[in-house]
A protein has these predicted regions:
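Metal-dependent amide/peptide-bond hydrolase catalytic core
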Residues: 1-172
Length: 172
């Protein structure tokens, strides 16, 4: 109800810490989470509303609360032309079936995103193994059991080198 239905936003409160014993009401609780959007203004709105709701809820119970933004990565914005050029390079090196374009982007949080506001960037994901290849592979990136197929790294290096050569050739 805070955002239009077609405005993508993910708010995850993934950590809640309070007290040390199950039978004692703690003096303090700390909730930590993440906000992921495609738009900096939407992120700012969500953070503001979290602060307002937190404050109102605490006051309703005669308490106090504060919201602190500890770190923030902006939404990633790929340069469309550079991203398409790198996708074509990947197709030339590895075949069309090896390339999957995420037209709508993803909701990942990435420090690299800060660079995308300073210069043209293309953020690429390199597949690093599937469960069909090996039962150890195919877990999500932030899973405690994740294992990557490191044999893919030369392909990633080849793509970056080839993409750089193409970029330089286009500018001669």
């Amino acid at each position: 109800r805070e955002l239009p239905a077609k405005t993508p936003a993910i708010v995850t409160m993934g950590k809640f810490s309070a007290g040390h014993a199950p039978n004692i009401i703690p003096q303090e609780a700390v909730i930590e989470g993440t906000i992921r959007t495609f738009d900096r203004d939407v992120t700012a709105l969500i953070l503001r509303r979290i602060g307002e709701i937190t404050d109102a809820t605490a006051r309703a119970f005669r308490g106090s609360a504060s919201v602190e933004e500890l770190a923030s990565a902006p939404p990633l914005k790929n340069d469309e032309a550079l991203t398409e050029q790198m996708a074509r390079c990947a197709e030339m090196l590895f075949g069309e079936k090896s390339v999957y374009r995420l037209r709508e982007g993803g909701m990942g949080s990435e420090d690299f995103a800060s660079y995308t506001y300073e210069l043209p960037c293309a953020y690429l994901l390199l597949g690093a193994g599937t469960a069909q290849e090996d039962a150890r592979y195919g877990k999500p990136m932030h899973n405690e059991s994740v294992v990557f197929n490191e044999n893919i790294l030369p392909r990633g290096s080849a793509l970056l080198a080839y993409g750089a050569m193409q970029w330089l050739e286009d500018r001669q």
